[in-house]
A protein has these predicted regions:
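Active-site nucleotide-sugar/metal-binding loop of Leloir-type enzymes
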Residues: 54-68
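Anion (oxyanion) recognition and catalysis
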Residues: 32-35, 91, 194
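Short beta-strand-to-loop acidic/aromatic patch adjacent to the donor-nucleotide binding site
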Residues: 65-77
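Conserved acidic residues
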Residues: 39, 67-69, 96
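Polar low-complexity intrinsically disordered regions
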Residues: 13-14, 46, 75, 87-89, ...
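Conserved catalytic core of nucleotide-sugar-dependent glycosyltransferases
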Residues: 57, 79-174
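C-terminal catalytic/acceptor-binding lobe
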Residues: 2-5, 163-234
Protein backbone atom coordinates (compact mmCIF):
# COMPACT_ATOMS: atom_id res chain seq x y z
CA UNK A 1 0.00 0.00 0.00
CA UNK A 2 1.41 3.38 -1.04
CA UNK A 3 1.54 5.85 1.84
CA UNK A 4 -0.24 9.06 0.89
CA UNK A 5 1.86 12.20 1.19
CA UNK A 6 0.70 14.50 3.97
CA UNK A 7 -0.15 17.91 2.54
CA UNK A 8 1.67 20.87 4.02
CA UNK A 9 0.76 24.48 4.73
CA UNK A 10 2.39 27.89 5.05
CA UNK A 11 0.69 30.98 6.46
CA UNK A 12 1.08 34.52 5.09
CA UNK A 13 0.01 37.99 6.15
CA UNK A 14 0.79 41.66 5.53
CA UNK A 15 1.08 44.34 8.20
CA UNK A 16 2.32 47.88 8.72
CA UNK A 17 4.69 47.00 11.53
CA UNK A 18 2.29 45.96 14.27
CA UNK A 19 -0.40 43.28 14.60
CA UNK A 20 -3.26 42.81 17.04
CA UNK A 21 -2.48 40.48 19.94
CA UNK A 22 -5.65 38.49 19.29
CA UNK A 23 -4.40 37.83 15.75
CA UNK A 24 -1.09 36.46 16.96
CA UNK A 25 -2.76 34.41 19.69
CA UNK A 26 -5.02 32.80 17.10
CA UNK A 27 -2.17 32.05 14.70
CA UNK A 28 -0.05 30.40 17.39
CA UNK A 29 -3.02 28.40 18.71
CA UNK A 30 -3.80 27.19 15.19
CA UNK A 31 -0.18 26.29 14.44
CA UNK A 32 0.08 24.23 17.61
CA UNK A 33 -3.34 22.61 17.85
CA UNK A 34 -4.69 22.04 14.33
CA UNK A 35 -2.62 18.91 13.65
CA UNK A 36 -1.56 20.24 10.23
CA UNK A 37 2.07 20.14 9.10
CA UNK A 38 3.21 23.76 8.77
CA UNK A 39 6.14 24.78 6.59
CA UNK A 40 6.76 28.29 7.81
CA UNK A 41 5.24 31.74 7.81
CA UNK A 42 5.63 34.61 5.37
CA UNK A 43 5.19 38.27 6.25
CA UNK A 44 5.39 41.48 4.23
CA UNK A 45 5.78 44.79 6.04
CA UNK A 46 4.64 48.09 4.55
CA UNK A 47 1.67 50.16 3.46
CA UNK A 48 1.33 49.22 -0.22
CA UNK A 49 -0.98 46.25 0.13
CA UNK A 50 -0.99 45.14 -3.52
CA UNK A 51 2.81 45.21 -3.64
CA UNK A 52 3.02 43.37 -0.31
CA UNK A 53 0.72 40.59 -1.48
CA UNK A 54 2.53 40.30 -4.81
CA UNK A 55 5.84 39.97 -2.98
CA UNK A 56 4.45 37.34 -0.64
CA UNK A 57 2.85 35.13 -3.27
CA UNK A 58 5.98 35.12 -5.42
CA UNK A 59 8.23 34.42 -2.44
CA UNK A 60 5.98 31.54 -1.40
CA UNK A 61 5.69 30.03 -4.88
CA UNK A 62 9.43 30.30 -5.63
CA UNK A 63 10.97 29.49 -2.25
CA UNK A 64 8.50 27.72 0.03
CA UNK A 65 7.50 24.24 -1.08
CA UNK A 66 4.30 23.85 0.94
CA UNK A 67 1.25 22.56 -0.91
CA UNK A 68 -1.11 25.17 0.48
CA UNK A 69 -0.95 28.82 1.53
CA UNK A 70 -3.28 30.32 4.13
CA UNK A 71 -3.79 34.04 3.61
CA UNK A 72 -4.70 35.98 6.75
CA UNK A 73 -5.31 39.64 7.45
CA UNK A 74 -3.38 40.84 10.49
CA UNK A 75 -6.57 41.73 12.40
CA UNK A 76 -8.37 38.41 11.93
CA UNK A 77 -9.15 36.21 14.96
CA UNK A 78 -8.58 32.67 13.72
CA UNK A 79 -9.11 29.48 15.74
CA UNK A 80 -8.04 25.89 15.03
CA UNK A 81 -11.70 24.86 14.75
CA UNK A 82 -12.53 27.49 12.12
CA UNK A 83 -9.32 26.86 10.20
CA UNK A 84 -10.04 23.12 10.06
CA UNK A 85 -13.44 23.80 8.51
CA UNK A 86 -11.57 25.15 5.48
CA UNK A 87 -8.74 22.63 5.63
CA UNK A 88 -11.12 19.68 5.65
CA UNK A 89 -12.97 21.03 2.60
CA UNK A 90 -9.86 21.45 0.46
CA UNK A 91 -9.11 19.40 -2.65
CA UNK A 92 -6.12 20.13 -4.86
CA UNK A 93 -8.12 19.36 -8.02
CA UNK A 94 -11.74 20.26 -7.33
CA UNK A 95 -11.45 22.81 -4.49
CA UNK A 96 -8.02 24.45 -4.90
CA UNK A 97 -9.16 27.88 -3.66
CA UNK A 98 -11.55 28.47 -0.79
CA UNK A 99 -12.48 31.21 1.62
CA UNK A 100 -14.08 31.51 4.99
CA UNK A 101 -16.12 34.50 6.11
CA UNK A 102 -15.34 37.62 8.11
CA UNK A 103 -17.24 40.86 8.32
CA UNK A 104 -16.57 44.49 7.49
CA UNK A 105 -18.80 47.55 7.29
CA UNK A 106 -19.45 50.39 4.87
CA UNK A 107 -19.77 52.65 7.95
CA UNK A 108 -16.39 52.41 9.72
CA UNK A 109 -16.09 53.83 13.24
CA UNK A 110 -19.83 54.50 13.54
CA UNK A 111 -21.77 53.53 16.69
CA UNK A 112 -23.96 50.97 14.89
CA UNK A 113 -21.92 49.68 11.99
CA UNK A 114 -23.88 47.23 9.86
CA UNK A 115 -21.78 44.06 9.47
CA UNK A 116 -21.47 42.72 5.93
CA UNK A 117 -19.72 39.56 4.78
CA UNK A 118 -16.62 39.95 2.63
CA UNK A 119 -18.00 37.54 0.03
CA UNK A 120 -19.05 38.81 -3.39
CA UNK A 121 -20.54 38.09 -6.78
CA UNK A 122 -19.43 39.94 -9.90
CA UNK A 123 -22.18 42.22 -11.20
CA UNK A 124 -22.76 44.64 -14.05
CA UNK A 125 -23.01 48.22 -12.77
CA UNK A 126 -23.62 51.54 -14.59
CA UNK A 127 -19.91 52.34 -14.33
CA UNK A 128 -18.88 48.88 -15.57
CA UNK A 129 -18.24 45.49 -14.03
CA UNK A 130 -18.39 45.59 -10.26
CA UNK A 131 -19.26 43.45 -7.27
CA UNK A 132 -22.19 42.97 -4.96
CA UNK A 133 -22.01 41.45 -1.51
CA UNK A 134 -23.57 38.10 -0.75
CA UNK A 135 -26.25 39.42 1.61
CA UNK A 136 -28.01 37.89 3.41
CA UNK A 137 -25.34 35.29 3.97
CA UNK A 138 -26.65 31.69 3.94
CA UNK A 139 -25.72 29.74 7.07
CA UNK A 140 -23.63 26.57 7.06
CA UNK A 141 -23.41 26.43 3.28
CA UNK A 142 -20.59 25.45 0.93
CA UNK A 143 -21.01 27.29 -2.35
CA UNK A 144 -19.17 28.81 -5.29
CA UNK A 145 -18.71 32.60 -5.20
CA UNK A 146 -16.96 35.12 -7.44
CA UNK A 147 -14.70 36.98 -5.03
CA UNK A 148 -13.86 37.56 -1.38
CA UNK A 149 -11.49 39.40 0.88
CA UNK A 150 -8.05 37.87 1.33
CA UNK A 151 -8.33 37.85 5.13
CA UNK A 152 -9.12 34.13 5.52
CA UNK A 153 -8.35 32.36 2.26
CA UNK A 154 -6.78 28.95 1.58
CA UNK A 155 -5.00 28.44 -1.74
CA UNK A 156 -3.31 25.44 -3.37
CA UNK A 157 -0.01 25.90 -5.22
CA UNK A 158 -1.68 24.87 -8.49
CA UNK A 159 -3.72 28.10 -8.46
CA UNK A 160 -0.58 30.13 -9.16
CA UNK A 161 0.64 27.61 -11.74
CA UNK A 162 -2.66 27.80 -13.61
CA UNK A 163 -2.69 31.61 -13.58
CA UNK A 164 0.87 31.71 -14.90
CA UNK A 165 -0.09 29.35 -17.72
CA UNK A 166 -3.36 31.08 -18.62
CA UNK A 167 -2.20 34.70 -18.19
CA UNK A 168 1.59 34.88 -18.51
CA UNK A 169 3.11 38.09 -17.18
CA UNK A 170 -0.08 39.33 -15.51
CA UNK A 171 0.41 40.44 -11.88
CA UNK A 172 -1.49 38.47 -9.27
CA UNK A 173 -2.33 41.57 -7.22
CA UNK A 174 -2.87 45.15 -8.33
CA UNK A 175 -5.04 48.16 -7.55
CA UNK A 176 -6.70 49.64 -10.62
CA UNK A 177 -9.06 52.50 -11.40
CA UNK A 178 -10.26 55.34 -9.19
CA UNK A 179 -13.37 56.50 -7.35
CA UNK A 180 -16.38 54.32 -8.27
CA UNK A 181 -14.26 52.33 -10.72
CA UNK A 182 -11.56 51.55 -8.14
CA UNK A 183 -10.76 47.86 -7.70
CA UNK A 184 -8.77 46.73 -4.69
CA UNK A 185 -6.02 44.15 -4.85
CA UNK A 186 -8.19 41.34 -3.48
CA UNK A 187 -11.02 41.77 -5.99
CA UNK A 188 -8.42 42.17 -8.77
CA UNK A 189 -6.88 38.83 -7.74
CA UNK A 190 -10.21 37.05 -7.95
CA UNK A 191 -10.93 38.65 -11.32
CA UNK A 192 -7.64 37.11 -12.50
CA UNK A 193 -8.65 33.80 -10.92
CA UNK A 194 -12.00 33.97 -12.72
CA UNK A 195 -10.31 34.66 -16.04
CA UNK A 196 -8.06 31.64 -15.49
CA UNK A 197 -11.26 29.59 -14.91
CA UNK A 198 -10.36 28.60 -11.35
CA UNK A 199 -13.35 28.13 -9.02
CA UNK A 200 -13.57 29.91 -5.67
CA UNK A 201 -15.49 28.11 -2.95
CA UNK A 202 -16.82 29.57 0.29
CA UNK A 203 -17.71 27.80 3.53
CA UNK A 204 -20.11 30.11 5.34
CA UNK A 205 -19.68 28.06 8.53
CA UNK A 206 -15.99 29.05 8.66
CA UNK A 207 -16.56 32.47 10.23
CA UNK A 208 -13.82 34.35 12.06
CA UNK A 209 -13.71 37.56 14.06
CA UNK A 210 -12.40 40.83 12.64
CA UNK A 211 -10.88 43.35 15.05
CA UNK A 212 -12.11 46.86 14.13
CA UNK A 213 -12.57 50.23 15.81
CA UNK A 214 -16.03 51.52 16.49
CA UNK A 215 -17.61 54.34 18.45
CA UNK A 216 -19.23 52.83 21.55
CA UNK A 217 -21.71 55.62 22.21
CA UNK A 218 -25.30 56.12 23.31
CA UNK A 219 -26.69 54.67 20.06
CA UNK A 220 -24.92 51.41 20.83
CA UNK A 221 -26.25 51.47 24.39
CA UNK A 222 -29.80 52.14 23.16
CA UNK A 223 -29.57 49.19 20.77
CA UNK A 224 -29.45 46.99 23.86
CA UNK A 225 -32.53 48.60 25.44
CA UNK A 226 -30.68 51.12 27.64
CA UNK A 227 -28.63 48.27 29.05
CA UNK A 228 -31.50 45.76 29.36
CA UNK A 229 -30.61 43.94 26.17
CA UNK A 230 -27.82 42.04 27.87
CA UNK A 231 -30.27 40.26 30.17
CA UNK A 232 -31.04 37.68 27.49
CA UNK A 233 -27.34 36.94 26.96
CA UNK A 234 -26.57 35.86 30.52
Amino acid sequence: MVKQKKETLAVAWCDNGMVDGKFMEGVVDTLINSGVEFCGSLRAHGNQIAQQRETLVNRWYDNNKSDWLLWLDSDIMITPEKFLKLWNRRDAVDVPLLTGVYFTSDQPEQPLMRPLATVYEFAELPEGIGIRRLDPLPKNTFLKVSAAGMGFCLMHRSVITRIKEALPGVPFFAEVGANKQFTGEDIYFFAVVNKAEIPLWCDTAATVGHMKRFNMGEDYYDAFGRGKGYAGLS
